[in-house]
Amino acid sequence: MNNHFKCIGIVGHPRHPTALTTHEMLYRWLCAKGYEVIVEQQIAHELQLKNVKTGTLAEIGQLADLAVVVGGDGNMLGAARTLARYDIKVIGINRGNLGFLTDLDPDNAQQQLADVLEGHYISEKRFLLEAQVCQQDCQKRISTAINEVVLHPGKVAHMIEFEVYIDEIFAFSQRSDGLIISTPTGSTAYSLSAGGPILTPSLDAITLVPMFPHTLSARPLVINSSSTIRLRFSHRRNDLEISCDSQIALPIQEGEDVLIRRCDYHLNLIHPKDYSYFNTLSTKLGWSKKLF
């Protein structure tokens, strides 16, 4: 066993038998190689593992050197928002659909992971967004996002009127179905579907992408990631929401603003040694191949 990683966490929310099979294979393989392994509690319960060290996501973040997330991008997003708070590296085995964030092929995961455990990997720091719903002199409601923060109506679709301030300076007003505020990581997700630009992961930038704006002049805007975005609302409705990674919703009440900024911590995401971002784009998005 090498000294690059000593304690490995196994993470994920198994939804079908193939994912559970991968979890079990990974656990037994790591134990056989002599690593200390800590398994997320739900996985250990589903696999009926006995005499195994288990923990919550937060405990895995505190104790492990590396977390292996088995599942799709949704599993990775859910785990990464918690794990990003800790000094832990994260890699994913794809058991979902696209797999932009989960690089390892489940059929070749052992060999790829063996190389990673020997220290042969590519490391990236992916920043998160922090969203606050706040009113003057009131307690804030806060969440974070790896991909995007989305302003949208609650249960019934309708037009929203709002103003956007960047670093407390008025930028524009808009009537639309909402607004997507995306990180470079999220630029290939919901933002892409809404016509937003693709940003390479190392860019220190945030995109603001309108959702069905009621004007032909509204276009996506790219700003520095050090900027703070404030959303203000002109209506008296109280059915608006902010969604983080399409997994966490924060309701917006009358008189409240939304403040979005770059988070203080980041995700330590690692990839196999042969990883290429542009090859991932070509494969996942069906781009044409090289001509010569």
From Swiss-Prot:
Homology family: Belongs to the NAD kinase family.
EC number in record: 2.7.1.23
Group of enzyme by EC: transferase
GO cellular component: cytoplasm
Function text: Involved in the regulation of the intracellular balance of NAD and NADP, and is a key enzyme in the biosynthesis of NADP. Catalyzes specifically the phosphorylation on 2'-hydroxyl of the adenosine moiety of NAD to yield NADP.
Keyword Cytoplasm: yes
Protein's name according to its UniProt entry: NAD kinase
Catalytic residues (positions): D73
Cofactor list: a divalent metal cation
One term of GO molecular function: NAD binding
UniProt catalytic activity: NAD(+) + ATP = ADP + NADP(+) + H(+)
Taxonomic lineage from the root: Bacteria, Pseudomonadati, Pseudomonadota, Gammaproteobacteria, Enterobacterales
Keywords from the UniProt entry: ATP-binding, Cytoplasm, Kinase, NAD, NADP, Nucleotide-binding, Transferase
Subcellular location: Cytoplasm
Database matches in InterPro entries: ATP-NAD_kinase_N (IPR017438), ATP-NAD_kinase_PpnK-typ_C (IPR017437), NAD/diacylglycerol_kinase_sf (IPR016064), NADK (IPR002504)
GO BP, sorted A to Z: NAD metabolic process; NADP biosynthetic process
Sites where the protein binds NAD(+): D73, G74, N147, E148, H158, R175, D177, T188, A189, Y190, S191, L192, S193, Q247
